[in-house]
Amino acid sequence: MIKVSILSMMLFMKPEITNSPEETKKLAKEIASKLKGGETIGLIGELGAGKTVFVQGLAKGLGVKETVNSPTFVLMKVYKIRDSRFAIRDLVHIDCYRLSNSQELLNIGVQEYFGRKDAVVVIEWAEKVKDLLPKNSMMIEFKEGENENQRIIEINRF
C-alpha cells in the first residue's frame, strides 16, 4: 500500500516507486487529497513515463467524472470539480509537448489560472515552460524503473 506525505517527500527527497499504472494513479489520488487550491504542478518525464496516468489519478482523486486524456493538440483542458469536499473548482491540464517556446503557453491564457485558490494547474512537459511557472510550483519527475511498468517518481519544489 502506498502511503505518502507530500511534505515528507519534498523534505527528504525520497522517491516513490510505483509498479503499475494503477499504483501511479493511487499515488496521485493521495496527493490530490492534500491539495488546497492554488497549486501549480509541473510534470517532467519522457514520452510514456506516466505523466498522463498521474493526471488521471489526480483528477479522479479530485472527483472529476470525465475521461482524462492528454490535451496534446488542444494544449489545455479545464475539468470542472463539483465535489463538495474540495474548494477547488477547476483542474487545469496542460500539455506542452508541441510547444516550441513559452510564449505559446501565454497565448492560450494559462496565467489566469496560476495561483487561483479555486484551481489546480497541472502541466505535462513542464521543463519547456519553467520560466513561466510560479516560484512555489511542485515539480514531479517520472523515470522508468527496472521494468516497463515501474516508475521512480520524485517530487520537489521548484
Predicted features by range, described:
Residues 47:
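The conserved Walker
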Residues 51:
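Conserved lysine of the Walker
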Residues 64-79:
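Short beta-strand-centered segment that lines the nucleotide-binding/catalytic pocket of NTP-utilizing
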Residues 1-12, 80-90, 156-158:
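Short, basic, low-complexity termini and linkers enriched in Ser/Thr/Gly/Pro
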Residues 11-30:
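N-terminal pre-Walker A segment at the start of P-loop NTPase domains
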Residues 12-14, 60, 101-105, 111-158:
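Short phosphate-coordinating micro-motif centered on Lys-Gly-acidic
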Residues 41-43:
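Hydrophobic anchor at the beta1->P-loop junction of P-loop NTPases
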